[in-house]
Amino acid sequence: MDPLKSIVQDQHVILTLPSGNSKIVELKPDSSVSLGKFGAFQVNDILGWPLGTTFEIYYDNVEEIVENKKKKPKSNELNKVPVGKVRLYKEVATDDKAEEEVEEMDSSAVIPVELQNVLSSATNQGLINIGNDVQKLTMHDVERFKQQSASANEIITKMIESHGSFHQKTIYSQEKYLKRKKQKFAKFFTVDYLSSSMLLKFLVEKGDIQRVLDLSEESLGMILNLTNIRSDGTYLCMDETGGLIVYTMLERMFGGKEDLDAPGKIVVINENEHPNLDLLKFSNYSEKFIEKHVVTLSILDYFRPPTMEEVEGRFTPLSKEEVNKLKSGKRSAYSRKLKWYYTQLRVIEMATKQQYDGLVVASTLHLPSLVPRLAERVHGARPIVCFSQFKETLLELAHTLYSDLRYLAPTILETRCRPYQTARGKLHPLMTMRGGGGYLLWCHRVIPAPEPEIEEPTDVNADEQEEKKQKME
């Protein structure tokens, strides 16, 4: 099965819950996934279905669950959610007459199925707030319905029927009430592919904005567009977002498929001893694929790479006959040194010989002094894109690049995508949208042509000028 289209085992996916929150899970076979108050399900029950499918959790053995709750639970089963079964989630179907009425109505005035047989008021002037007494259905009744394995739609329908002043609400207020109850009692979830944009959205909703340097989805897309990421390119990248930008570049280069023979490669420069690419574990790429197409170098090795004489002075490879004569202990030590030798050769190649097809920088280091040194190995007519949380940093970088003839037209960009909230007769921006998103600087690496030499006038030209003067006289 294609992991880009179907739900397969050992795959990271993102689950969208009725409350609007998301959860990242790894689908290990023969295991269960708990969604808290929304229930739990077996992973094997959803394998093979297309990505984007919505499932509903239900329980058949309700009596057994109630009996288990009455028993004294063990210490490891105190907060354990009972595992239920899953089925395809289907919205409540409308009858033929209601469907015809909906088709005749304007698209902005479509009423939810649950509210089509419920009266509503044009205004809420007759609505009197008397608190919880307006609802005749108690929480004990709701819990009893849940223990009887009643679906969310059945519980919500009973709550609407038991509401004393529901018919005095406006249709818009009724829709908001219906939405809140679905978020509370529904037990469905949607399985989606964990793309880089979905991962960024999950991190922002979780509150890890500083982890991704306040990067927005629009800025992430602009980075790919301006850098002109291609499948056969070799790109230099400095990523301090935990590997999110590298994951996005891998998606654009390989499309989520593992092709070990693909020529594309990403060279990641890290300022610490070990690279921070923790988010690549959610990319569904194997470690073998990542090791081949993602090369990591420390910033010290890139700026001051070792020479070939220094590497060969510390270690010289042996022939096969000499290796076979070594004992087991010395052979393992030789293997470690040989691995170090090939690593140093790769460092020398990437830092001194390789020409890159683009440069992407998302770092908190001082960009005006960092970018010109990183861009020395970028090929001519190739883009350079720098991301920063603050415009002032990019302004200083732009002034530095303007005075250097190797960089063409540094431009600072800012992207904003403003979602709008719509209601009947109303349209305004979403009030809960977040600001920020960062800024981008974009330019091209060029190779300046040498200045033409100024030729001094020869003696022949001087003689001709003297003859012209004599004729004029």
From Swiss-Prot:
Substrate-binding subunit of tRNA (adenine-N(1)-)-methyltransferase, which catalyzes the formation of N(1)-methyladenine at position 58 (m1A58) in initiator methionyl-tRNA. It comes from Candida glabrata (strain ATCC 2001 / BCRC 20586 / JCM 3761 / NBRC 0622 / NRRL Y-65 / CBS 138). GO terms for molecular function: RNA binding; tRNA (adenine(58)-N1)-methyltransferase activity. Heterotetramer; composed of two copies of TRM6 and two copies of TRM61. Pfam families: Gcd10p. Belongs to the TRM6/GCD10 family. The lineage of its organism: Eukaryota, Fungi, Dikarya, Ascomycota, Saccharomycotina. GO terms for biological process: tRNA methylation. PANTHER family: TRANSLATION INITIATION FACTOR EIF3-RELATED (PTHR12945), TRNA (ADENINE(58)-N(1))-METHYLTRANSFERASE NON-CATALYTIC SUBUNIT TRM6 (PTHR12945:SF0). Residues 452-465 have a biased composition (Acidic residues). Keywords: Nucleus, RNA-binding, tRNA processing. One of its GO terms (cellular component) is nucleus. This is tRNA (adenine(58)-N(1))-methyltransferase non-catalytic subunit TRM6. Residues 452-473 are annotated as: Disordered. It is found in: Nucleus.
